[in-house]
């Protein structure tokens, strides 16, 4: 990823194939724990390879970086088709590397794609995999999308006891 970005270009199809295999940090919490001696090599390698900000974001994402099964994604799109959706502005609000974009059926390919991803590495991979999409790497609450802009929001956002500040909606205590 760093080489591709350093050369200021988009990934080739072969590089996209490699990048698409990235599954996030969700299963690697032990690799971020200095006290886990059997993960010591991985811990030190991550500290060496990632910038301090990348490391912090990757470590924070270990609790919620789990990707959705293709079976579930296909079913969600089948449901959208049955509801009559064929094209429009599509939002993936917690996109990971964009598996929902990648599995979008041909019948919806004329849609305009918008994605948001909090983790820097994951979001940068998504940008390489879907250069035609508008991918923002930040918390969704920090985006400036207008209300009523999206025709469909699809994805599998993290579940948990998270509360974020959003000036527009804080008064409702969402």
What are these regions (language model features)?
Residues 1-129:
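Class I S-adenosyl-L-methionine
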Residues 94-174:
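SAM-dependent methyltransferase catalytic-core segment centered on the flexible catalytic loop
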């Amino acid at each position: 990823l760093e080489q591709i970005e350093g050369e200021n270009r988009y990934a080739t199809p072969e590089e996209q194939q490699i990048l698409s295999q990235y599954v996030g940090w969700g299963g690697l919490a032990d690799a971020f724990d200095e006290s886990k001696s059997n993960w010591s090599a991985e811990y030190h390698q991550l500290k060496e390879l990632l910038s301090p900000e990348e490391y912090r974001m990757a470590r924070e994402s270990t609790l919620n970086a789990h990707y959705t099964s293709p079976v579930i994604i296909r079913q969600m799109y089948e449901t959208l088709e049955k509801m009559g959706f064929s094209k429009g502005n599509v939002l993936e609000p917690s996109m990971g590397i964009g598996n929902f974009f990648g599995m979008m059926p041909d019948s919806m390919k004329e849609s305009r794609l918008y994605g948001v991803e909090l983790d820097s590495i994951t979001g940068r991979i998504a940008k390489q995999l879907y250069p035609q999409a508008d991918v923002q790497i930040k918390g969704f609450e920090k985006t400036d999308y207008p209300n009523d802009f999206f025709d469909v929001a699809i994805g599998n956002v993290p579940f948990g006891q998270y509360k974020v500040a959003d000036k527009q909606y804080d008064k409702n205590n969402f």
